[in-house]
């Protein structure tokens, strides 16, 4: 007989066979199989357990499993190397206790060893067995009242689940296969037991090592921390009393998904907190979002601490306590999509944020893409202009040179979660993350449930209905299309629109749901300061303030009254906010616009606009902050002014281009031309290191290579044709417009912008060339070119309309009389006509000059010269 050794009883295979742990030294623990000497208990068998097999095992389990005990080996079977001996504590001997309860019997081959210390032990065992036999205990009594155990899985798992779902069932953990899968004996009644396989709900553990025990099986290595997770559960649950909650069937349809509750708590939470498992996303339907969220919180802490399977994870947690990242209140200024917003903080700073863990209808998805505008409109109506509470969840790093963006939880004042509201309505999907992802919404599982409910309820883009908005037309695409839409847009006096974009203080891009179209709109009767079109330009004073006020309308509902449309397809009229507030008056009252009447403006509105502007001037607000009212001039000064004769302005010029509409561009001969020649030479050297611009926009100052002479010129982009990769560029030193490929356009360095554009735009005074529709149009342009191009001319400025001068052109070699001017020569040659009186308002009328021109015109008419050859062609004047 060996000495007693202190050990820990790990597992009771039966009433008399155990797995024990013996500590060999400070670090090494040996596990071995050990059986009680001299006795045997009823056996568990595949074909059916012997009576009282469970009772014997349960008796031993309750007494010694999980507890320290003294173990002494009495003998060893040579063939199996199994040790047999005694297990005892300070209170009892296990074999003797089993015999006394009738749960074991002496082995037939066991005999007394007279004269040895074992003899007295054997005698005590015999006495214990005699006691059980005398009182007919256990196996010595009737066997009709024993436990019946069903070892096979339930024949109908779904029916079994339905019968026991929601109940708390007592049981014992029999075996542990992986960290997240156990075999449990359920106590359906005191004498009716059922063995089932339970997968832990809410957690997925790495696979442990598996050793094949038959040819049909395949051994496998553990996943990282797989054996550690299994051992974690073994030490806490193996042959322990637990409470089981069945929740659902496992995917295999045979085993069950459930909670395994130890007196210390749910084992799943302990696995997650130790980093030995990850949250199983697909268990949300069984557990519900509240439980899943609590599990994710536990998992997140393990990730941050890099425990277990998260040891090597790359975790980037934002400093939520940082001042710039704290929760803040803001107003929604723009809804870009159902997952991206722009909000304005209380300090006026606007920032772009994304709603955590959701995605708007994807353009690449054929089923989702048609609902993009409908989804955005749903959210816009709910939150635009409203105050919200923003909480940072995580920061998503920027990609493709884009900045990082804050992913946040946004709540309305009543506590409504915006992301949850959108997903419930079927206008966004929930992002599926990788299992090692830390960054996700704190209500991620609620979002998953909401998405599932929206799909089942056929809401939003899951409805299968036709999208509310499709095939939207751009009514301002061209002048022709805008005029086609004018009557339909004017049919409703106040047309309901949505302000899609703000171009300037008085210019907007609107969307009309009723007419299913977009269009450009400008406030009639006012002008606002011009904003800078690019970084190289400088806006007019108070342009930003005017634009800022106009942006308060962005994505808000408004009403517009359409009055007319201009030649660029922009509709003109009045815009009203809050149904009755004219926005033009608001701009005028704050000194951010000035009056500019129009022909059809009513006297009432004209007076109202001017009175509002006058009040702003008097209050010195906005652009009128330094306004000084004009003083009344003395009578003598007025008289002198009346008698003063205006000196005519003469310019030495050279024509640089003749446009198709009869206007022409000229350069003033002087220092400007000399500076331009130097600049053109420098541009030629810049061509050697030419690099096309990556981004080309309308209004951009550029250096462009002309296709006519392959030279480089300064210019301004007028129109971009993205489809053909070309742009219409005004070469503003010469006045010509060319279509130039993007590959021949580069940004213009600031050093080349100091010299102002050298070309001036002009038209001939008193006369007009035939229109492009005339058969004589090309002939007239050719004659004009022969008379004026490549010659030093003198231009007498007669007036101007905007930036277009009205001039009389003289060729010094022809003479200085008016009858010798190019204007008169064109009329005499029948290549131009005297303009009607209604078109002479932009320059001073010279009666003598007009008489000369009319004489030339009458002579050409009578002699059938030029376009008078077949009679009177002047019907085009009307």
Swiss-Prot record:
SUPFAM superfamilies: Staphylococcal nuclease, Tudor/PWWP/MBT. Pfam families: SNase, TUDOR. CDD domains: SNc (cd00175). It comes from the Eukaryota. SMART domains: SNc, TUDOR. The keyword Repeat applies. Residues 695-755 form the Tudor domain. It comes from Schizosaccharomyces pombe (strain 972 / ATCC 24843) (Fission yeast). GO terms for biological process: mRNA catabolic process; regulatory ncRNA-mediated gene silencing. The gene is snd1. This is Staphylococcal nuclease domain-containing protein 1. Its main location: cytoplasm. One of its GO terms (cellular component) is nucleus. It is found in: Cytoplasm, Cytosol. The modification Phosphoserine is found at residue 316. Keywords: Cytoplasm, Phosphoprotein, Repeat. GO terms for molecular function: nuclease activity; RNA binding. Residues 3-142, 167-312, 326-464, 493-626 form the TNase-like domain.
